[in-house]
């Protein structure tokens, strides 16, 4: 009798998006569509207590260029015992070094990778796998600063980042983010076909079934999934999600 080999684990990264000192969720990344969920520290500690191994922490004020929650984020990272991926407003050496000095496992570069490819290549060269690049996509067009500007063709930018030696990509379909409409599996399949680097999926995850589908893509190169609104809205619990994703 043959036994099926279990699928590898899909890493889950519960999201904590921060606006004006509060943990919030946005719909399709639009300012003004926030729903507040208490303090970022409470949210992050809650995910840690429920078994998360990662938290995806985003300073949305910094991402939109309207301020910073740096001191608050420092407290959150300092209190957590699990790994943190930090995103939002990392556009120059100073902001990048400050973020890494917090002790996060990795940072996620977004707009900077589109607007300043030379700097991004240098950052990748300096910090290696501590750098992930966030590719926020509408169709195959990249969205830039806070998702409000266009940033070029996905495949052109990916080719450039591959040449620079980027270690990991965080891929968000911005038309699905915060909508609970399901992830863009076709986009993820195309991404892993074009890179040998791990891909983290973001946007649209609405059900445990969605997580099963994403876990089936792990052998192809989808390493993890950022989960936000579905957790906050109670579509499923984090322990349920971790069971589906495969606990270590």
Curated annotation (Swiss-Prot):
Pathway: Amino-acid biosynthesis; L-histidine biosynthesis; L-histidine from 5-phospho-alpha-D-ribose 1-diphosphate: step 4/9. The keyword Cytoplasm applies. SUPFAM superfamilies: Ribulose-phoshate binding barrel. It is found in: Cytoplasm. GO terms for cellular component: cytoplasm. It is an enzyme of class 5 (isomerase). It comes from the Bacteria. PANTHER family: 1-(5-PHOSPHORIBOSYL)-5-[(5-PHOSPHORIBOSYLAMINO)METHYLIDENEAMINO] IMIDAZOLE-4-CARBOXAMIDE ISOMERASE. This is 1-(5-phosphoribosyl)-5-[(5-phosphoribosylamino)methylideneamino] imidazole-4-carboxamide isomerase. It comes from Arthrobacter sp. (strain FB24).
């Amino acid at each position: 009798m043959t036994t099926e080999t279990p699928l590898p684990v899909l890493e889950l990264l519960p999201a904590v998006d921060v606006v004006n000192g509060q943990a919030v969720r946005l719909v399709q990344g639009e300012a003004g569509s926030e729903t507040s969920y208490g303090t970022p520290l409470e949210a992050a500690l809650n995910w840690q207590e429920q078994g998360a191994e990662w938290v995806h922490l985003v300073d949305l004020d910094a991402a939109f260029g309207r301020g910073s929650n740096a001191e608050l984020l420092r407290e959150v990272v300092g209190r957590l015992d699990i790994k943190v991926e930090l995103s939002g407003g990392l556009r120059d050496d100073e902001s990048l070094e400050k973020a890494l000095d917090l002790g996060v496992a990795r940072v996620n570069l977004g707009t900077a990778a589109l607007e300043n490819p030379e700097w991004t290549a240098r950052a990748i060269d300096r910090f290696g796998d501590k750098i992930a690049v966030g590719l926020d996509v509408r169709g195959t067009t990249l969205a830039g600063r806070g998702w409000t500007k266009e940033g070029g063709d996905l495949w052109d930018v990916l080719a450039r980042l591959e040449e620079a030696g980027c270690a990991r990509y965080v891929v968000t379909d911005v038309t699905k983010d915060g909508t609970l409409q399901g992830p863009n599996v076709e986009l993820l399949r195309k991404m892993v076909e074009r890179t040998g680097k791990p891909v983290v999926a973001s946007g649209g995850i609405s059900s445990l079934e969605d997580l099963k589908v994403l876990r089936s893509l792990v052998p192809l190169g989808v390493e993890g999934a950022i989960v936000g609104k579905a957790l906050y809205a109670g579509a499923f619990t984090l322990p349920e999600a971790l069971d589906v994703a495969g606990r270590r």
